């Protein structure tokens, strides 16, 4: 929903027109508690952008540990934060990932904490001890559990802790 643009000088810029319309439409329909922004870590690690120099859409293939990934996402997060602050939406916005591995999550957390340390981050996925205290919103699948001490620590910090339940294994 956010259009990523590569400028002729190699810098990144972004258009929020579609994103804004979607967020406003959802708010008009009562869905306005959080804005969950997916995903810094897509399945194939390809990022679509419009290349202003060629006038064509292209893909940047950048694994989460690469300098290209860090450059793109640093620019993205800083721009997105500014935009969300201007709209008054930053405090309810969360950068979210779905079912990603520990290495990719740690890479994404590192970029986010360096670029925009006050941006909230969430994961719906497997349990990783290393992420328990890093994520604002942590939603575990139905076969994963936090320890009692981890749950209490998250509760005391005001972090969101959820469980996703799927019954597909009962078929």
Put a short name on every predicted segment:
Residues 116, 134-138, 156-161:
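Glycine-enriched alpha-helix->loop->beta-strand junction motifs that scaffold or abut catalytic
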Residues 146-150, 157:
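Long amphipathic alpha-helical scaffold regions
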